[in-house]
């Protein structure tokens, strides 16, 4: 069974998010369900996105929030859960709840590449507005926020430099943008290596094979 972005519990919240619905967790969940999970052999259930109360035994659970790990505390009440983290530093923060592993973030490279455009603009911040709270940027920085993904990718592609983290940073690199750091937790943009969804499949398969012996 797969609990994902289509689950009624998530959709109820999703419809109330406004511009916040265009978030990385939603699109990563879509790619997990479409491009990765069907190619991984396991008898475990899957949880690809966070919804309060949506946990289950013997499952693979994808962690999206690297800031507020306490939200995942209820997982410790469930048996045999594997927590998949997209950032190495998150692993030790959540392993008190269940077995935690690191799977590098990946994107659908070919899908992103179709939005590549000529570079005609300078610098932009790309991501949710909340991630830049209490941070200051130069006056010439544009802000690409609250946009549907395809529109965002096309706009981002026109910039030479982009402030971004996570999958957004990987997408920027696919589009030929130079990624600049802005989050003090991730001072080195080289953390965000370009990896296609297909490359993540054997890594995740190997992790689960090792876990399940």
Question: What do the PLM-derived regions correspond to, one by one?
Answer:
Residues 189-213:
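A charged, aromatic-enriched C-terminal amphipathic alpha-helix characteristic of glycosyltransferases
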Residues 61-62, 100-105, 142, 179-183:
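Short hydrophobic/aromatic-enriched beta-strand-loop microsegments
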Residues 3-4, 63, 85-87, 125-127, ...:
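Short beta-strand/turn micro-motifs composed of small residues
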Residues 90, 96, 102-151:
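Conserved catalytic-core segment of nucleotide-activated headgroup transferases in glycan assembly
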Residues 1-4, 13-16, 118-130, 162:
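Short hydrophobic beta-strand segments
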Residues 2-93, 190-192:
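Extended catalytic core of nucleotide-activated donor transferases of GT-like folds
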Residues 140-198:
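Donor nucleotide-activated moiety binding/catalytic core segment of transferases
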């Amino acid at each position: 069974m797969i609990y994902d972005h289509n689950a009624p519990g998530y959709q109820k919240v999703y419809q109330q998010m406004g511009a916040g619905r265009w978030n990385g967790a939603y699109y990563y969940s879509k790619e997990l369900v479409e491009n990765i999970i069907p190619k991984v052999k396991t008898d475990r259930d899957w949880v690809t996105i966070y919804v309060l109360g949506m946990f289950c035994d013997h499952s693979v659970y994808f962690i999206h929030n690297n800031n507020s790990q306490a939200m995942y505390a209820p997982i410790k009440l469930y048996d045999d859960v594997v927590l998949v983290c997209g950032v190495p530093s998150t692993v030790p923060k959540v392993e008190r709840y269940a077995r935690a592993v690191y799977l590098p973030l990946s994107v659908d490279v070919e899908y992103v590449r179709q939005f590549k455009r000529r570079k005609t603009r300078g610098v932009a911040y790309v991501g949710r507005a909340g991630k830049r709270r209490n941070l200051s940027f130069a006056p010439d920085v544009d802000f690409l926020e609250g946009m549907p993904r395809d529109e965002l990718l096309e706009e981002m592609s026109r910039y030479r430099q982009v402030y971004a983290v996570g999958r957004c940073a990987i997408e920027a690199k696919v589009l030929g943008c130079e990624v600049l750091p802005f989050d003090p937790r991730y001072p080195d943009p080289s953390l965000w290596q370009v990896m296609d969804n297909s490359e993540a499949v054997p890594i995740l398969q190997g992790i689960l094979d090792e876990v399940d012996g």
